[in-house]
Amino acid sequence: MSWPGRVRRGRPEASKAAALVEPAAAPVERASPGLAALFDALTQDGRHSVLDLGLAGDRHLRVLSRFARQIRFAGFIPHPPEGDAWTSALEALPPNPCRPYDVVLAWDILDRIDPPQRAGLVERLVALTAPDARLYAVVDASGAATSRPLRSTLTGVNRVSVLPVGPPKPARTPLLPAPLERVLAPFAVTQAFTLRTGLREYVAVKRS
């Protein structure tokens, strides 16, 4: 058999293998009334101090730098540490030496960690933040059976680009409004928005 014949015979197997490879996900940009409400309460003079539980990015930083000169990225989203590494990461999260953080971007961290970890996270945020700190969080209340880790990037004060960065995983039980308020205390929910996609966005303010 000629060499070209052998190549042709191998192509179906190559095509089959290629079909098993998950295609790269594309980012999806959406409006965010929760972020709009958060930023509307801030001043664009650089005085704020931001703790972002996600990752840094140029476009993301351009939006935040309108409001803050001091920004720390924890890197807990999209892939939070697990087990003892989670506890160590929380303990290692440093305070801002100049002034306590007064803005927290928590993204969908509450969907990504177990209930005991949620309590530890909020306790650490309370220790690191100013008395009137504001917090933004989003949870998936769609009831979907699976969810994917997401990387969120600010594209404006009222828009966010969301990129899936991992395979689907079984979704946790949706965190409903009343349990979420208990989880976040002493951050008190002041505004909540339900999106058509089933997401719920929350803005909360720390109370003494």
Predicted regions and their residues:
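Hydrophobic adenine-recognition pocket in adenosine-nucleotide-binding enzymes
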Residues: 109
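A short glycine-rich, Lys/Arg-flanked "PGG" loop and its adjoining helix->strand segment in the class I
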Residues: 119-134
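A short His-aromatic
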Residues: 112
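Class I (Rossmann-like) S-adenosyl-L-methionine-dependent methyltransferase catalytic domain
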Residues: 1-42, 57-94, 134-208
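Conserved beta-strand/loop positions that form the S-adenosyl-L-methionine
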Residues: 53
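Hydrophobic beta-strand segment of the Class I
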Residues: 104-105
